[in-house]
């Protein structure tokens, strides 16, 4: 995975179940649009949000923005999020609340398996990592070493 990193200057969060935001997201001029499966989606609507992704991805990308999907942190939610999110039109997954490299490696294995199942190039899906607590700070270098890494927010 030696391809160049994306040049994302502006990223726009869009709740994947919000028709109002989906309808206009592609007109806002963002370099990347983040379809949110995490905080903007209540637990009862998580599955509906996953099912909405195949229609939402090309819709928000129609003016050339890259598409990123923010998945949930708990593994029981992250696994179905990955199954729904990894597809040719999704450039990256945003991984929230990362605490260490082990979690990132595990998610990378799941993404690799999903890409292979879909016949996609392994490594197509990049990672944007969100460091949201101090426990991860000693592990930043190891987290950043993940080959799928496109960016990190601390």
Place the predicted regions along the sequence by residue.
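Conserved alpha/beta-domain cores
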Residues: 2-154
């Amino acid at each position: 995975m030696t391809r160049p990193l994306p040049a994302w200057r502006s990223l726009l969060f869009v709740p994947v179940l919000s028709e109002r935001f989906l309808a206009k997201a592609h007109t806002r001029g963002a370099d990347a649009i983040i379809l949110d499966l995490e905080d903007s989606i209540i637990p009862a609507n998580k599955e509906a949000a996953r099912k909405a992704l195949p229609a939402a991805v090309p819709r928000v990308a129609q003016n050339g923005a890259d598409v990123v999907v923010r998945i949930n942190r708990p593994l029981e939610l992250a696994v179905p999020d990955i199954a729904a999110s990894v597809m040719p039109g999704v450039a990256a997954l945003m991984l929230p609340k990362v605490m260490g490299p082990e979690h990132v490696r595990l998610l990378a294995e799941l993404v690799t398996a999903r890409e292979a199942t879909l016949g996609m190039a392994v490594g197509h899906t990049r990672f944007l990592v969100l460091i949201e607590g101090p426990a991860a700070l000693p592990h930043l270098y190891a987290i950043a070493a993940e080959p799928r890494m496109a960016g990190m927010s601390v």
